[in-house]
Amino acid sequence: MIKWPWRTQPPAQQDSYPWPEACAIPLLAALGDDEQQRLIALARQVIRQKRLIPLQELRVTPLMEARIALLFALPVLELGIGWLDGFHEILLYPEPYVLHEEWEDDIGLVHCGPSVQAGQCSAQGPVVLNWLDVRDSFDCSGYNLIIHETAHKLDMRNAGIASGIPPIPLREIAAWEQALHAAMEAIQEEADLLGKEGASMDAYAASEPAECFAVLSEYFFSAPELLSERFPAVYAHFARFYRQDPLQRLYQSGLLTPESF
């Protein structure tokens, strides 16, 4: 088991991670210098406050640790590290893992069998990830396992359950729900028409509101131009909640122009 250093570690220990190399991924390319430095500061807090536990003899390097911490820090860049206080451990498998689970089908029959998982979390439990999918989360494809699980944790701060409604002002809940459910219906309609593989967005978002919030949070940070185009109301709600505007960040950095899409 690897224990990430705690707050009592001297500052020199915090600086032993290769932060410039860790930040050199497409997902973080649009960050300004000030944003990048604040993100690194938050990532250092993640490293101090959480325990990273590699499983199945996975060897974790400082670069891997740093990038994992950066991805946890990104959604709370403007919210603050306190929003991640719902867990203390990160379990890291080498690749997707198998769980034996029970589930109920559409007619009420209960089944039991193996289920392949990319990651998972619960209200007070650890965040479970796998390195293969984390490694695929550094680009701007709309897929990001760490942001997905972090969104669930943020969602669970509202009454301890994942409902698709994180802690937001009461006056905004009705409009939030309306926008989220409209997106779910549109995503399901597209998947029914084109098939899950042909759909422009992950059809898993249509399965339930909690998954819609988590999946669309992945797009918000890693493919904001797609989310803004498909579901502008959802994008606006997410921008207010996360207090970030990744699409504007792309424009300001020059990585995206109005003619790009």
UniProtKB/Swiss-Prot annotation:
Binds 1 zinc ion per subunit. Zn(2+) binds at residues 111, 148, 152, 211. One of its GO terms (molecular function) is aminopeptidase activity. Its main location: cytoplasm. Its cofactor is Zn(2+). InterPro entries: MetalloPept_cat_dom_sf (IPR024079), MtfA_enterob (IPR057256), MtfA_fam (IPR010384), MtfA_N (IPR042252). HAMAP family: MtfA (MF_01593). Belongs to the MtfA family. This is Mlc titration factor A. The lineage of its organism: Bacteria, Pseudomonadati, Pseudomonadota, Gammaproteobacteria, Enterobacterales. The gene is mtfA.
